[in-house]
């Protein structure tokens, strides 16, 4: 299968509706690629996923949200007042579940143009928990699932958003996303989330095709989502 690419073709974006994040991402999540957000627990990864889902729902799109982190319906409803009847939240409990879910919805989305976003929160949870020491087998599993996700993004021209956990490189102390090069080289956009003092969060561009790496914004997680106001007491 081949497709000619037009240089005049407009790149579609899904804005999150948060000015500071939409500014950082140059308009939102890019369609046709996988975007990765990584960071420590509690840094705001799931909140960003929920905001993205809500944004797509407001546009009348169907959304698939595959969850391994413990999706909070209460939190989602506090963030999103849009009609959620087109949101499909699928809880997975193992690496096999995750692959079955990705495979199932890749086939559904390929035939249904009403889907506008695919979310996997978190991609690496079960790879981390179920690793057996067989690195080659794990790499093959990584590649197979990432290939399916890339296919969803490219064929249907929708954003695919995944979250990833972190580890510390014992050689130099760097904080890196789980999966290393195997995951990194497939991602076209990567953002890091960090927890800062006073409840602030920081989002940094680590890799992007059209945004300068190292650019960052700060925000707060609030009752109804994310606030770009970071002054104390707000």
UniProtKB/Swiss-Prot annotation:
InterPro entries: DNA_recomb/repair_Rad51_C, DNA_repair_and_recomb_RadB, P-loop_NTPase, RecA_ATP-bd. Signal peptide: none annotated. Keywords: ATP-binding, DNA damage, DNA recombination, DNA-binding, Nucleotide-binding. The keyword Ubl conjugation does not apply. PROSITE patterns: RECA_2. Pfam families: Rad51. GO terms for biological process: DNA recombination; DNA repair. GO terms for molecular function: ATP binding; ATP-dependent DNA damage sensor activity; damaged DNA binding. SUPFAM superfamilies: P-loop containing nucleoside triphosphate hydrolases (SSF52540). Disulfide bonds: none annotated. Belongs to the eukaryotic RecA-like protein family. RadB subfamily. Involved in DNA repair and in homologous recombination. May regulate the cleavage reactions of the branch-structured DNA. Has a very weak ATPase activity that is not stimulated by DNA. Binds DNA but does not promote DNA strands exchange. This is DNA repair and recombination protein RadB. It comes from Thermoplasma volcanium (strain ATCC 51530 / DSM 4299 / JCM 9571 / NBRC 15438 / GSS1). The gene is radB.
